[in-house]
Amino acid sequence: IILVVLIAAVFYLVRNNIFTRINSYLSNNEKTFIRIRNICLIIIGISGAAWVLLTQSNAGADQYYVLDAARGLRNGDYSAFRYNGYIAKYTNQIGLLFIEYIIGFIVGDYNYLFWQLLNVVMIVFTYKMFSDILEILKLPRIASLSTIILGILFFPWTLYSVFIYGNVAGLFFATSA
């Protein structure tokens, strides 16, 4: 039912040239476009931070093992790198381990809340960079704004902020490259 309503709404908006009028307005009003974009990004940030603070989830499985390996590395315990150690088995985690190792000097060991809130910040900036990329490609401003609005509605990515994996950071660094 939701899909049918969404299709009907898009059909109505296209048929009545509402998208064209909105895009024309946004193209002529830079301040309005930036204000709407920033409000949408703030909504994504607030919803992500609220999710992180309300769930208070702790790392488990791989997330914990990488944080544990970073702590061990800072304390001279290299068992995670030895034969059958976690990092020796899962070398794909070395990038995340390096980031957690460096930042761990500042925020401490097993600081789940910091990493989760950092994920929220990276999600917000990823959506901003998506918007900037669409501007560089000279796509209509409505496309740039629609991407961020759909980001508000796409809960799985925001909910993913509680997982301390490299996916959020990877997409963030990939879009900023």
Model-derived regions, located:
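Start-transfer (signal-anchor) and selected internal transmembrane alpha helices
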Residues: 1-51
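Helix-to-loop transition at the C-terminal end of transmembrane segments
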Residues: 47-67
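Short helix- or helix-capping micro-motifs
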Residues: 44-45, 144-155
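Extracytosolic helix-loop segments that constitute the early lumenal/periplasmic catalytic or substrate-binding loops
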Residues: 64-88, 95
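Alpha-helical transmembrane segments of multi-pass integral membrane proteins
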Residues: 88, 115-122, 166
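Juxtamembrane segments of multi-pass membrane glycosylation machinery
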Residues: 75, 80, 95-118, 138-141, ...
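Transmembrane-helix motifs of polytopic, lipid-linked glycan transferases
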Residues: 117-138, 176
